[in-house]
Regions:
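Class I SAM-dependent methyltransferase Rossmann-like catalytic core
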Residues: 65-128
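A short acidic, Gly/Pro-enriched loop at the edge of an enzyme's catalytic core
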Residues: 177-189
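A short SAM/SAH-binding and catalytic strip from SAM-dependent methyltransferases
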Residues: 188-200
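Conserved Class I S-adenosyl-L-methionine
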Residues: 230-257
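Conserved beta-strand signature within the Rossmann-like core of class I S-adenosyl-L-methionine
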Residues: 215-224
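Core SAM-dependent methyltransferase catalytic element
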Residues: 257-281
Length: 281
């Protein structure tokens, strides 16, 4: 017996297809309602609670052990400490002669508090999927910041870190004033306690804008002193806090998720999280 052909047969097949689609839609709707009921009424989910694995990895003894074992591993496998020098990766004498030696002296310090406070802000932004972001991390000093970011939701495979020195393959040698990346390469740029070491902040900002995508998440945190006091190297960069930094981004600074200038004992910690906007080509 042949299947019915012609307009009537087509209508029959279309009717079956529509019926199947409607049934699938009803089943999906029921499944969604059930998940919502379980997730909201029976076992409410937390949007910020860590997995048991990551909780254990972040406990102080375990985290410190991970950090030091990785440092030892890179040393034993022949990854020697490398650094940029003036004329070979760094053009600024100020950065090469003052900033680099100072930060090299602090290469073994783990600043968990500073990093985790910033991460807490990011994890509070509704709908932000940290693991999906191809992120540039500027100036981590060592692997601690990268371990923290990955333990709190960033995908380690999508983290690209740069600094003036490095003992790890996870951190590339590069100056934030001259980034070796193509335009619009990153979904996010994370720069914590780095920008005020610059003696040419507008250039560093311009490079950030260049390598970030339109709509990228931009995160800056830094310390500055009271107006006129000068910083550790005699400069007083961004003395008016996040407003000064946002002014440098100008029209490229879009929606601001977070902005703070916190004072403690005469020193200020500024933090700002915003969307980068770029003019349409």
């Amino acid at each position: 017996m042949q299947a019915e052909r012609g307009p009537a047969g087509n209508r029959c097949r279309m009717g079956v297809t529509v019926e199947k689609a409607e049934r699938a839609g009803v089943e999906t709707s029921h499944a969604r309602r059930f998940r919502n009921f379980v997730g909201r009424s029976l076992v409410p989910k937390s949007p910020v609670l860590l997995s048991l694995r990551n909780y254990i990895l972040l406990t102080p003894p375990v985290f410190a052990l991970r950090f030091h074992l990785r440092r030892l591993y890179w040393r034993l496998t022949g990854h020697k400490l490398q650094q940029l020098v003036k004329g070979q990766g760094v053009e600024s004498g100020f950065v090469a002669e003052k900033v680099l030696p100072y930060n090299l002296g602090n290469i073994n310090i783990i600043n968990r508090g500073r990093t985790e406070r910033v991460i807490a802000i990011l994890r509070s932004i509704r709908g932000l999927k940290l693991g999906a972001l191809n992120t540039l991390v500027v100036g981590p000093r060592n692997e601690a910041e990268l371990l923290l970011l990955s333990s709190y939701g960033f995908d380690p495979a999508k983290l690209t870190a740069i600094d003036l020195f490095s003992y790890s393959p996870a951190v590339r040698l590069m100056d934030m004033h001259e980034l070796k990346f193509s335009d619009s390469s990153f979904d996010a740029v994370y720069s914590a306690f780095v920008i005020t070491y610059s003696d040419d902040i507008p250039k560093a900002v311009a490079e950030t804008i260049r390598v970030a995508k339109d709509g990228a998440l931009v995160v800056f945190v830094y310390e500055h002193l009271a107006l006129g006091a000068g910083n550790r190297f005699g400069k007083n960069n961004l003395s008016n806090g996040p407003d000064d930094l946002l002014a440098l981004f100008g029209a490229n600074a879009g929606h601001v998720f977070w902005k703070e200038d916190f004072e403690s004992e005469g020193s200020y910690t500024s933090s700002v999280v915003f969307r980068l906007t770029k003019p349409k080509a």
